[in-house]
């Protein structure tokens, strides 16, 4: 099953997440199919907090991909802002 979820990057105590389309059986930070955005939980000031390619997310949802809980809330937030 294909899922859209967060893949952690960044350094220790400074997380940075890529929003990726991946097979649900692959490791969290392992192989992915496509990168569709990023999420920076520590963003402050003028720094961009979240960027999501909503066209690609909708394409994958149409093809049967499921969203993780956190990504679902980020997509909802991005749709409100758009």
From Swiss-Prot:
GO terms for cellular component: cytoplasm; small ribosomal subunit. Pfam families: Ribosomal_S16. One of its GO terms (molecular function) is structural constituent of ribosome. GO terms for biological process: translation. InterPro entries: Ribosomal_bS16, Ribosomal_bS16_dom_sf. Keywords: Ribonucleoprotein, Ribosomal protein. PANTHER family: 30S RIBOSOMAL PROTEIN S16, SMALL RIBOSOMAL SUBUNIT PROTEIN BS16M. Belongs to the bacterial ribosomal protein bS16 family. This is Small ribosomal subunit protein bS16. It comes from Histophilus somni (strain 129Pt). The lineage of its organism: Bacteria, Pseudomonadati, Pseudomonadota, Gammaproteobacteria, Pasteurellales. The gene is rpsP.
